[in-house]
């Protein structure tokens, strides 16, 4: 919020927040499909955010604030609306990973129009880095494609490599994000997630964190968007 206030005081948009999933081709295809209206309204979203492992200093708060925070931003952008409520529930905890982290967790978000979203965070699956997004619409189910490695047939088996971190999975998105920032900066404007987007993401993440600690459903309450960010 302080960044939003400082930017408005400066009188010009100066901040591009580092949410790179908006630049991923899979998410862009999903958004185009939703925005087209061809498949009706989005009703439900089923998502997952899985990592092979995380450092030993990870704790419960980081499942939302370091992991699922990316879903909080990209799904708000994808659907074009804010959240109304947030909750976080626990699965049976894996024996893998840090002692202060209950893993996996499920975050449930409801948008202001009533779209229900569930996001699984499993950050010690000891397997691969895997991001999923399925959108259930009135007339179709939309699944996000993902870039793949080649399929190899060898020694009477078929196999395909899997991603092990976000830098492999989202390499093209990172490059597109940075290039967008460079191009916009050279031209003297901001193009991408704004400071207001960052504020909205942090409000929802804070509500989800409170929901996790209290095991309740929490409202997501934003300030009214200033005219400065409506332009």
In which residue ranges do the predicted regions lie?
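Short aromatic-enriched loop/helix-cap "lid" or pocket-rim segments at secondary-structure transitions
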Residues: 27-29, 56-60, 98-101, 131-132, ...
